[in-house]
Structures are given as C-alpha cells and as structure tokens.
Regions:
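Canonical Rossmann dinucleotide-binding motif of NAD(H)/NADP(H)-dependent dehydrogenases/reductases
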Residues: 1-13
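Conserved glycine-rich Rossmann-like NAD(P)H-binding loop of the short-chain dehydrogenase/reductase
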Residues: 13-28
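Conserved residues in the N-terminal Rossmann fold of short-chain dehydrogenase/reductase
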Residues: 21, 43-44, 84
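Adenine-nucleotide cofactor-binding loop residues
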Residues: 25, 48, 181
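Conserved Rossmann-fold cofactor-binding substructure of NAD(P)-dependent oxidoreductases
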Residues: 35, 41-62
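Hydrophobic/aromatic anchor residues within beta-strands of the central parallel beta-sheet
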Residues: 42, 82, 105, 145-148
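Conserved Rossmann-fold NAD(P)-dependent oxidoreductase catalytic core, especially the SDR/UDP-sugar
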Residues: 65, 69-129, 133
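NAD(P)-dependent short-chain dehydrogenase/reductase
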Residues: 119-120, 125-202
Length: 204
C-alpha cells in the first residue's frame, strides 16, 4: 500500500482511492502520509465481512485484492483462520464485486500457489482458481477478474530481506542450500505488474 498508493495517484490521478483493511494502526500511519489529499479514503473492514465489502465497493471501478493470511507458520497454526480469510474472503469479494458492478479486479497471488507444499500456498491456489472462475460467474455483469503471481517482493512485509536485515548484526545469515535461488522483484515492479494486468486483462 505504501508504494502502490502514491505511484497510482501520480500516474492515474483517480477521483477516489479507497484503502480497505482491518489494521487500524497501519491505516493511521498511512493517513498521516496522505493528509490533505481528498482523493484518498480509508475504511476499516475485513474481507470476511460481506456486508462491509458491499458498502466499501459502492462506486468503485477497480479493485486490487491483497488481503491474505500470508505468514506460512501462522497459516499452519491458525489454519481455520487462514481458510476464512484466503478462501472465504475471496468468495465474498468476488460476489460483492459482481453485484456492485466493479469493472476490473486483480488478485495478488504468490509463487507458493504453484505446486503448494503448505496451507498458505494451497489456500492461495484455491483463491486463484476462484477468481479465474469468477469470469464465468458474472452473468450479464461487465466484471473481469485476473490474478498476478508475484515472486519475492524486495522490502515487502514478510519477505526475506527485512528478515536478513534484522539478524545481520549477528553475523550469520541462514541459507537452506548454497545452490538455492530466489526470484525477486522490487516493490515498484510489483505495482507496474498490477497496472499491466488492469490494462491488458481479458479475464483469467
């Protein structure tokens, strides 16, 4: 959000940009960054709450779906909660976007959804399939859904780089295998990928 919002405001100058999340502290911090910008609105809510989604989506044309339980150990430990957010939350958003006439929706996914080996990856794969199938679920509504799968986003919350930076003072960085490679993109590249999806999406 901290990267997507200013880049989108600068490039597209939308009439209204709504940040919808359940974390009031993060919203409070973002409000200070965009104080005085009437284009930016903040709504507390949860994708699990369908009624709140309907209210939040009133008059909205484009949606970026980034809500997820995404810390792998947390997803394994609180598995029911992970499913409620990542799967049921996706279903709620699909229904609400269709009913409210949203034009285009891009759901952010992960490389962990490809041949998943943990619950987080499995729920994101399920979410991806739901969004793709949403295109055949729209009926007469002119709503399109697409999914983009990120690699590791450098500097994002939960990525390996902030983790390494937090422990580098100890002088030892844990590497699973010295042959291991990770696909990385920058935060800015992640935003541009979403823009590209909005511009070129055919649904899927």
């Amino acid at each position: 959000g901290h990267t997507f919002v200013p880049m989108t405001l600068k490039k597209y100058n939308p009439k209204r940009l709504v940040i919808f999340s359940r974390d009031e502290m993060k919203q409070w911090e973002m409000k200070k960054l965009f104080k005085g910008d009437d284009r930016v609105r903040f709504l507390i809510g949860d994708v699990r709450d369908k009624d709140r989604l309907y209210r939040a989506l009133d008059g909205i044309d484009y949606v970026v779906h980034a809500a997820a339980t995404k810390i792998v150990p947390t997803a394994e430990y609180d598995s029911f909660e992970c499913v409620k957010t990542n799967v049921f939350g996706a279903m709620n958003l699909i229904d609400a976007c269709i009913d409210k006439g949203v034009k285009r929706i891009v759901s952010l996914s992960t490389d962990k959804a490809s041949a998943p080996s943990n619950l987080y990856g499995a729920t994101k794969l399920t979410s991806d399939r739901l969004f793709v199938s949403g295109n055949s679920y729209t009926g007469s509504h002119n709503t399109s859904f697409s999914v983009v799968r990120y690699g590791n986003v450098m500097g994002s919350r939960g990525s390996v780089i902030p983790f390494f930076m937090s422990i580098v003072k100890d002088g030892v960085l844990p590497i699973t295998d010295n042959r291991m490679t990770r696909f990385m993109i920058s935060l800015e590249e992640g935003v541009e990928l979403v823009w590209h999806a909005f511009d070129d999406m055919k649904g899927g």
